[in-house]
């Protein structure tokens, strides 16, 4: 997590604007800190970077806004990594709750939303919820909250993700990327892993978007979006 905090400071020094993409491999001399933007309404080819003009949800001052947003993202990742639902619930917007999206396309009518106390209760209730449908087969995703978290939230060590995007979709599959329209008053941080095994030829990439809205001057979690290659 210290590495991410260092990147926050680097972003401030470089004066990165909204639409920031942090390439963590830059610390090893393998890339550069770059500012790119774009949230397409139609998905590009599988796993390809998303290019285009920056689209931000509001007029939050870029340098301070990005630093605070990245810090909020770190807090959520800490809670997810330690499987601490109580800590996660404390970061959720008390009125809007947090909406879970199993694939990139946000479905405001069907995606499940939990208020903080509901989130804590669901963690221990053993109740299976209908989260949506699997890519390809179209089977119903019926899982308990802990099971869903393992498969569709913290399915990779996102606290060590090699690339981080602020209001920027780094890569996408066949699914529609509609985070900007689904959350017009919010900002998001995307944590991205490229293909992790050579045999998969890049098709095993994955990403986690954490969507935040301002509440009383602080960022509160309102959405968690899982992305991966889809059929």
Set out the residue ranges of the language-model regions.
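Intrinsically disordered, low-complexity, repeat-rich polar/charged segments
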Residues: 40-46
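C-terminal-biased regions
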Residues: 4, 8, 15, 21-33, ...
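Short, aromatic-enriched amphipathic alpha-helices that serve as compact interaction elements
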Residues: 67-83
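Solenoid-repeat scaffolds in large eukaryotic assemblies
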Residues: 84-88
């Amino acid at each position: 997590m210290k590495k991410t905090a260092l990147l926050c400071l680097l972003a401030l020094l470089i004066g990165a604007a909204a639409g920031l993409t942090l390439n963590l491999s830059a610390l090893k001399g393998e890339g550069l800190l770059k500012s790119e933007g774009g949230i397409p309404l139609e998905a590009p080819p599988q796993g390809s970077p998303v290019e285009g003009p920056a689209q931000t949800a509001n007029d939050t001052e870029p340098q301070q806004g990005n630093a605070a947003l990245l810090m909020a993202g770190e807090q959520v990742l800490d809670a997810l990594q330690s499987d601490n639902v109580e800590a996660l619930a404390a970061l959720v917007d008390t009125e809007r709750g947090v909406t879970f999206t199993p694939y990139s396309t946000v479905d405001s009518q069907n995606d499940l939303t939990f208020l903080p106390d509901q989130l804590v209760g669901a963690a221990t209730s053993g109740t299976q919820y209908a989260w949506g449908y699997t890519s390809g087969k179209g089977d119903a995703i019926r899982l308990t909250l802990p099971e869903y978290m393992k498969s569709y939230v913290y399915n990779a060590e996102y606290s060590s993700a090699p690339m981080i995007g602020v209001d920027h979709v780094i890569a996408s599959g066949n699914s529609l990327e509609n985070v900007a329209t689904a959350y017009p008053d919010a900002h998001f941080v995307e944590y991205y892993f490229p293909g992790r095994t050579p045999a998969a030829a890049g098709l095993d990439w994955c990403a986690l978007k954490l969507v935040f809205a301002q509440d009383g001057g602080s960022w509160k979690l309102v959405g968690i979006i899982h992305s991966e290659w889809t059929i």
